[in-house]
Amino acid sequence: MKKTFYHYMMKHRAALFRNEISDLAEAMYDDLSFPKQSEDYDEISSYLELSGMLESMSIFDEAWDLYIQDR
């Protein structure tokens, strides 16, 4: 069974050394409206852009690349 992007990102929460990806994971965890069941790049990207959760979408792109590599 494939992990959703949200499920994948939860392993980055409470990282020993904070970085932009661990900060994104924390923000996703705190956002009750985040599309937790989605595996769709466009859906998640649009949500993040509209929510203003990130200063730069390159953080999401980096996290998404790691997610794809891990699948």
UniProtKB/Swiss-Prot annotation:
<dbReference type="Pfam" id="PF06855">
    <property type="entry name" value="YozE_SAM_like"/>
</dbReference>
<protein>
    <recommendedName>
        <fullName>UPF0346 protein BC_2253</fullName>
    </recommendedName>
</protein>
<dbReference type="InterPro" id="IPR036806">
    <property type="entry name" value="YozE_SAM-like_sf"/>
</dbReference>
<dbReference type="InterPro" id="IPR010673">
    <property type="entry name" value="UPF0346"/>
</dbReference>
<comment type="similarity">
    <text>Belongs to the UPF0346 family.</text>
</comment>
<dbReference type="InterPro" id="IPR023089">
    <property type="entry name" value="YozE_SAM-like"/>
</dbReference>
